[in-house]
Amino acid sequence: MDFLLALVLVSSLYLQAAAEFDGRWPRQIVSSIGLCRYGGRIDCCWGWARQSWGQCQPVCQPRCKHGECIGPNKCKCHPGYAGKTCNQDLNECGLKPRPCKHRCMNTYGSYKCYCLNGYMLMPDGSCSSALTCSMANCQYGCDVVKGQIRCQCPSPGLQLAPDGRTCVDVDECATGRASCPRFRQCVNTFGSYICKCHKGFDLMYIGGKYQCHDIDECSLGQYQCSSFARCYNIRGSYKCKCKEGYQGDGLTCVYIPKVMIEPSGPIHVPKGNGTILKGDTGNNNWIPDVGSTWWPPKTPYIPPIITNRPTSKPTTRPTPKPTPIPTPPPPPPLPTELRTPLPPTTPERPTTGLTTIAPAASTPPGGITVDNRVQTDPQKPRGDVFIPRQPSNDLFEIFEIERGVSADDEAKDDPGVLVHSCNFDHGLCGWIREKDNDLHWEPIRDPAGGQYLTVSAAKAPGGKAARLVLPLGRLMHSGDLCLSFRHKVTGLHSGTLQVFVRKHGAHGAALWGRNGGHGWRQTQITLRGADIKSVVFKGEKRRGHTGEIGLDDVSLKKGHCSEER
């Protein structure tokens, strides 16, 4: 009876405990499959990711190169490798106890054992005494093949020397046996080789693999530009460019002094063809257009001829001969005295002086002494002034004079020189933005200093384009031209940048184009043909494209480009 009562009591307590259990999971699940409870749901723990079949797998960033991921950012390396991401070779020969009995040579991901002279390597890796190998005296041991002794080398990068006993290195880089990825150079080592990034590049883990990435020396401060220059990063290196108002190679920049030449006063031009030169003393020199004026072939000095009347009167000088060809600017004048000519006479060629013909009404009787001697050594000051076109020992050859020749105009006469250059810091330099396009080229401040052009963002759906045109004008018949420019087409869906040339009112297919990249790049293109009317840069963007198209440092030179890139 007592036993039955005890059994009933135990049964009631069990049923009460079972009724209180609601079947819910605990707050945290300690499991080897990476499951955790987050409030009322169960999901993969932090550092784990759910696979397509529903199981949670650990995630390692970066990935394990020679191993497997066993936990969040935790790699288990394969034999022969070490490191956090299993990307380093394990030197088994340095382990204790040593894996080899005699000689050990480490290889990438493994190792090899070799026996001393007089021993042979057995199949189990041990070394056994061999009188035959001892007699051969091999550097790295020997092997018996069909009863013959043959010395062996431990690596494919080693080969037997002519003596048949020692091993010499094989230069895989020179023989072409090496195979290095792009942008890496081969460096030979004893028994092997390594692939190393070129100068200006650094090995980085990008996109799930190791790549040679360009080093931005400008942003890192690893450049040697002048303090008056800007640093521009290019692929594998950098370049220095002097700032506005300075000149030089970028490593050394020298200030360019500003020179301004202003006229001393207003110049009155009388009726008729001719030119008036006004000096500092206020005396006007009227130079008529007379085709019969001659200048002696070699007259180093013109002797002064002074009239009896000292009052100020205009004097005449030879007729200028205009020419469209630009020349260097004028030299500082030396004292020269000319005399007011007599009424018109028949022109003759004197031996020691100058004879001119001018209208009688322009010069009254009498004359004055005017210091108009010209220095024979030509100089080249800048500015829009009257300058000699052909400087020589003959002073001015028949007074061939033109106005408005600058250093830029003079450079256009010489082949292979710069004929146009623009960095857009102070405007478009002759480039024209076509207004009928959907988009426009706009100047934007460069963080490194100055400005560059960029294509505005598209605001309507469909294809959009912005065109920048440079009319060549007189350069249209200059032959081949070298177009050089810096550009960048960066970002997600950045668009397209293209180069065209227009001939006979229309342009053909694009000569060059780019729709992606990283950072600024330098490009040179040879524009072939003598009938090019204009050069066109076309930038295309669509709505929603977040990338940037940039253009800067555009220049044109005569002739072919030294390097197409």
Swiss-Prot record:
Could you identify this protein by its name? Nephronectin
All copies of the EGF-like domain together span 52-87, 89-128, 132-168, 169-213, 214-254
- Pfam families according to UniProt: EGF_3, EGF_CA, MAM
The family assignment reads: Belongs to the nephronectin family.
- Domain MAM spans what residues? 420-563
What molecular function does GO assign, one term?
calcium ion binding
Oxidoreductase in keyword set: no
Q: What GO CC annotations are associated with the protein? A: basement membrane; collagen-containing extracellular matrix; extracellular exosome; extracellular region; membrane; smooth muscle contractile fiber
Residue interval(s) of motif Integrin interaction: 382-384
Q: Which species is listed as the source? A: Homo sapiens (Human)
Bias kind Low complexity: ranges: 304-316
Its primary localisation, in coarse terms, equals secreted
